[in-house]
Swiss-Prot record:
This is UPF0741 protein BCB4264_A5507. It comes from the Bacteria. It comes from Bacillus cereus (strain B4264). The lineage of its organism: Bacteria, Bacillati, Bacillota, Bacilli, Bacillales. Pfam families: DUF1450. Belongs to the UPF0741 family. HAMAP family: UPF0741 (MF_01863).
């Protein structure tokens, strides 16, 4: 089973146009779902994505990608 990324297209701190291409670089075979993730509180202040049903958040997109890569390499 491949990895799954879920990102919100409505949260203020998440820019789908820049985040999705970065996620594709992390895992080009992963499933990427874009839509509301009901994670609005943290999504106002931090960039986030759900990685295999687990939330991962960071102050910036670049920091988020580093955390996601670390999570997938475990």
């Amino acid at each position: 089973m491949g990895n799954e990324f879920r990102v919100c297209d409505d949260c203020q701190a998440t820019n789908v146009k820049t985040l999705v291409p970065k996620l594709k670089k992390v895992d080009s075979c992963a499933t990427i779902e874009v839509g509301c993730q009901s994670y609005c509180g943290p999504g106002r202040k931090k960039s986030f994505a759900f990685v295999n049903n687990r939330p991962v958040a960071a102050p910036t997109e670049d920091e988020l990608i580093v955390k996601i890569e670390a999570k997938l390499n475990k």
